[in-house]
């Protein structure tokens, strides 16, 4: 039987579900509260638009050396190209040996030079002869007074005074250091004031990158910040896997940063989710205030050489727009582009990045931070009541006895409402908020689809059968259902929105569940309303009886193969969803995504425009033309993917709410277009088959 052949008895007309006006009213009141929170969130997000374009000072030094140019000339060009901050790291003996401001030499090498006659300085020969040169120690001399003073101070802090001894080589002071020479060469030796001065003098801010001390004390912390005094600092981003002061002197770090009103930069993790873990970072952020925290991203060192400049520039624009990154730590390209010098290549990269950010509404300078944003507990509590009402409304639409009893609906609402709202009204309820967000992401898109099913059941005979009117009806239905699903998006955002979620100190849990659960919820409701066996079930039968019949059905090998493919598709669908993907994305899809990013302010999600929304259009066609209900069931479940995805987009709280909103709209518009094309193709297919069948009948 062709799939478009009419199935006259594919729904259960006696099963009429009533929608509680009381519960709907509570949902609407909760929606007002949710929208109030969301509008406030939007204002907070639009006020945070300044991005710090930074690069390592060492990177520009390397670029100058590679091109054989004066450092000042390269710095000036970088400034003109849009760079605002230079990252300055702690100095090391490796760097000091190269710039000649201080030298560390192994005692074994001095002894070797003494014995082979190449150590000619009388003062040093005297130290050897006095037995003051030990082969297992290192000896430090300075050639710049300020640098030597800072190195001496930091060596004593890091190693202790008992491991650093002052010697005299004639009129020159020498430090004898009890340390493994190779380790000493790599040891951090404090923030170099000469580099910070040069950075400021060239017109840049300093992005300070201090590291922690072993058994760090309050005095160590104060010494680090004292060295930063007098310099223009844009942000502090700690180096290594510990913040300065961890674990015992964190309050000193917090106090020093508060005193100087400094911004803490935290490095986004390589998974592009939350942060690179540094001991003490959460305590500093919490006590400093989340309104003094900015997110930093840097394209991985091994990835950047594979990216063309325009691709990298697009990466920066998308990163800052979609993930609330406000410190862009760039790297230099170490190979020139065709027909360009290495300097020209990098200046083009900097300039194009600056221009792309400006085109997207960003200003360039020391990073902005989010204002302290914690919505009213009263608004949030009212929102929670709306979520409770939505949960009860769903239950009433799948449990006939509950649907018939207004009393039990109210009782359930009171119970759920108290459990959800009371902790929030008391100023707590962080876990309840997550559960409310999870419920919003699953229940509201399900209610939207169920509401459509109930509406079209009553209008089945009135639905247009001809293609163009049917297509228009399907598009209108898609937009209306999408608008209803967006109620869930408003609730989800309102339940979670605060500064900690915008910065990703907290994240929504249950992303992968939201791709599956709405289909389950809609599937249950569908089986309560429709006989998927087209008249072979009693009208009084519902979900359980239909599931039993499905389980009792004999299974053929081809059915098993088909189910295996469906299962594989489901695994791929879920694995590629969520904050982190368990499966790679093909190059073809990456190119398709890039095209969408160029065409739209916010790239629509492929699961909406290619899967969910076209299936929605076809489901309307299936219902109007009375295709087999089993096929309608499958299309409705797939259509639910699109509705759930629209809401789930808002679970990525780091993405601005306006961008998430436009992403969903773009998905509906494109998805409706693709769905319309699919409807036309099926219409043509049916026409061709009908012609062929008529021709065969004439023979």
Language model features with spans:
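Non-cytosolic juxtamembrane linkers/loops
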Residues: 327-412, 416-428, 433
């Amino acid at each position: 039987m062709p799939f478009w052949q009419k199935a006259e008895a594919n729904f259960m007309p006696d099963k009429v579900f009533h929608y509680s006006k009381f519960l709907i009213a509570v949902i609407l009141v909760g929606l007002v509260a949710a929208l109030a929170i969301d509008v406030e969130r939007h204002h907070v997000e639009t006020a945070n638009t300044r991005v710090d374009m930074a690069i390592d000072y060492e990177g520009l030094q390397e670029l100058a050396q590679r091109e054989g140019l004066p450092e000042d000339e390269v710095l000036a060009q970088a400034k003109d190209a849009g760079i605002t901050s230079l990252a300055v790291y702690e100095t090391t003996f490796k760097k000091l040996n190269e710039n000649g401001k201080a030298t560390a030499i192994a005692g074994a090498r001095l002894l070797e030079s003494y014995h082979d006659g190449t150590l000619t300085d009388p003062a040093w020969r005297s130290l050897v002869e006095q037995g003051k040169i030990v082969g297992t120690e290192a000896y430090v001399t300075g050639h710049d007074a300020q640098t030597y003073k800072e190195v001496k101070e930091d060596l004593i802090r890091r190693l202790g005074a008992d491991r650093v001894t002052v010697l005299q080589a004639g009129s020159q002071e020498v430090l004898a250091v009890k340390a493994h020479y190779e380790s000493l060469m790599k040891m951090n030796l404090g923030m170099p004031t000469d580099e910070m001065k040069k950075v400021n003098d060239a017109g840049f801010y300093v992005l300070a990158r201090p590291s922690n001390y072993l058994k760090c004390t309050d005095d160590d912390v104060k010494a680090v910040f004292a060295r930063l005094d007098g310099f223009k600092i844009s942000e502090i981003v700690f180096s290594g896997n510990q913040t300065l002061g961890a674990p015992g002197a964190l309050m000193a770090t917090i106090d020093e940063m508060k005193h100087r009103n400094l911004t803490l930069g935290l490095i986004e993790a390589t998974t592009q989710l939350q942060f690179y873990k540094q001991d003490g970072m959460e305590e500093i952020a919490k006590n400093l205030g989340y309104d003094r925290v900015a997110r930093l991203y840097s394209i991985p060192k091994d990835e950047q050489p594979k990216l063309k400049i325009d691709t990298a520039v697009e990466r920066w624009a998308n990163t800052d727009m979609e993930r609330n990154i406000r410190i862009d730590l760039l790297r230099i390209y170490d190979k020139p582009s065709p027909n360009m010098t290495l300097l020209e290549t990098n200046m083009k990269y900097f300039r194009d990045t600056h221009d792309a950010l400006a085109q997207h509404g960003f200003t360039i300078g020391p990073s902005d931070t989010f204002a302290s944003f914690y919505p009213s507990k009263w608004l949030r509590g009212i929102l929670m009541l709306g979520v409770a009402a939505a949960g009860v409304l769903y239950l009433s639409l799948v449990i006939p006895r509950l649907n018939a009893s207004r009393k039990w609906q109210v009782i359930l609402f009171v119970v759920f409402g108290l459990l959800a709202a009371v902790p929030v009204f008391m100023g707590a309820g962080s876990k309840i908020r997550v559960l409310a967000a999870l419920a919003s992401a699953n229940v509201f898109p399900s209610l939207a689809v169920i509401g459509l099913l109930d509406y079209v059941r009553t209008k089945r005979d009135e639905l247009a059968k001809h293609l163009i009117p049917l297509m228009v009806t399907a598009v209108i239905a898609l937009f209306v259902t999408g608008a209803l699903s967006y109620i869930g998006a408003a609730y989800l955002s309102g339940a979670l929105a605060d500064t900690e979620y915008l910065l990703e100190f907290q994240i929504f849990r249950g992303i992968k569940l939201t791709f599956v659960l709405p289909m389950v919820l809609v599937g249950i409701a569908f089986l309560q309303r429709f006989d998927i066996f087209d008249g072979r079930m009693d009208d009084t039968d519902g979900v359980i009886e239909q599931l039993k019949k499905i389980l009792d059905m004999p299974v053929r090998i081809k059915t098993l193969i088909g189910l295996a493919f469906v299962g594989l598709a489901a695994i791929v669908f879920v694995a590629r969803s969520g904050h982190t993907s368990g499966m790679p994305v093909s190059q073809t899809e990456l190119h398709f995504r890039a095209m969408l990013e160029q065409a739209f302010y916010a790239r629509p999600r492929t699961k909406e425009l290619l899967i969910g929304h076209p299936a929605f259009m076809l489901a309307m066609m299936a219902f109007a033309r009375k295709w087999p209900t089993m096929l309608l069931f499958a299309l409705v479940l797939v259509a639910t993917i699109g509705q759930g995805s629209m809401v789930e987009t808002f679970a990525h709280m780091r993405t601005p709410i306006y961008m998430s909103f436009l992403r969903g709209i773009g998905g509906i518009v494109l998805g409706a277009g693709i769905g319309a094309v699919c409807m036309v193709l099926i219409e043509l297919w049916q026409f061709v088959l009908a012609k062929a069948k008529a021709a065969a009948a004439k023979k």
